[in-house]
């Protein structure tokens, strides 16, 4: 990954990272640092209102770039769900009204003809690009970024290129089949995600609470549990939370073993909203993976927590922009 991938001197790229609840936006210059960064909550926005917000942020950053005496070279946007490269449309199940949203058209309008190129890709693809550029996978050409948050996804870099698949949906790691027998609940989000995402941890804790008579620990004090509650209870030495985390480590380890055996990466980078507090379990996850994975490949891979944290996709969006510029003849 070219460490000077963000922008040439005197020019800047605009980077957008859209999540299910917020939008982060910044511009990058040749030094690879985000400038004029802002994070805006989506609040009640849905459908075209979310696209309009992205357009507003592009216009804001265009003004900031011009005020710094620079010019806009390209725009990159990371989005949840599936970004269709051919049409520029996006399917994002966590944004209402984005079943087939024409995002490229919205962003081209906001660019006002100033950007020579525009790239839209999945947040999982952006995360692995960001980590390979400025994060935990610098210098690596074969990397898997496993994102564990509300859901689960994987960004895959194979021989220096993002693996997107025939129809742009590669990396839907939440659908890894790790359990038997099949349960109908898996149809909504996938087996792995059902059990080991942030929502999965909360679901597992709630189920154990209902099965544990006489429990008086910290998890009994809340009506609706979250992964944050589970981590806090684990830190307090709660036995029930320890059971939840033990099971989660088994799922995360088995999934990593499958990814390593199939793809033979140099590095597995684990990130996402859950993996702030869960980074402490990385050694246990790697040990579990080694029980299951192909032994030669497992001996060649290293495991590391994200170094960019919540900014991984934003950095990756800058890389996407620069790649798009090169694709249309830029240097």
Labelled PLM ranges:
Residues 47-48, 52-55, 59, 63, ...:
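Glycine-rich phosphate-binding loop and adjoining helix at the ATP-binding site
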């Amino acid at each position: 990954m070219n460490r000077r991938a963000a922008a040439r001197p005197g020019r800047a790229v605009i980077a957008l990272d859209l999540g299910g609840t917020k939008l982060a936006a910044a511009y990058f210059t040749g030094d690879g640092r985000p400038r004029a960064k802002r994070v805006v909550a989506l609040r009640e926005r849905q459908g075209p209102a979310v696209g309009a917000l992205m357009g507003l942020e592009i216009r804001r950053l265009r003004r900031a770039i011009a005020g710094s005496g620079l010019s806009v070279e390209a725009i990159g946007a990371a989005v949840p769900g599936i970004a269709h490269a051919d049409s520029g449309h996006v399917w994002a199940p966590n944004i209402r009204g984005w079943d087939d949203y024409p995002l490229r058209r919205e962003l081209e309008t906001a660019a006002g003809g100033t950007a020579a190129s525009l790239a839209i890709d999945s947040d999982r693809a952006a995360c692995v690009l960001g980590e390979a550029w400025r994060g935990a996978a610098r210098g690596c050409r074969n990397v898997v970024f496993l994102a564990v948050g509300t859901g689960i996804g994987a960004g895959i870099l194979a021989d220096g290129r993002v693996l997107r698949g025939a129809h742009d949906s590669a990396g839907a790691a939440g659908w890894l089949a790790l359990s038997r027998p099949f349960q109908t609940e898996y149809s909504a989000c996938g087996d792995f995600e059902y059990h080991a995402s942030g929502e999965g941890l909360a679901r597992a804790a709630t189920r154990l609470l209902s099965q544990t008579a006489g429990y008086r620990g910290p998890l009994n004090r809340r009506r609706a549990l979250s992964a944050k509650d589970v981590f806090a209870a684990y830190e307090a030495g709660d036995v029930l939370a320890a059971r939840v985390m033990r099971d989660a480590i088994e799922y995360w380890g088995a999934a990593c073993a499958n990814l390593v055996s199939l793809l033979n990466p140099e590095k597995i980078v684990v990130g996402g909203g859950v993996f702030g507090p869960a980074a402490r379990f990385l050694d246990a996850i790697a040990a579990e993976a080694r029980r299951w994975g192909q032994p030669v490949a497992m001996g060649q891979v290293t495991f590391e927590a994200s170094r960019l944290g919540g900014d991984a996709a934003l950095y990756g969006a800058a890389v996407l922009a620069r790649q798009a510029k090169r694709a249309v003849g830029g240097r």
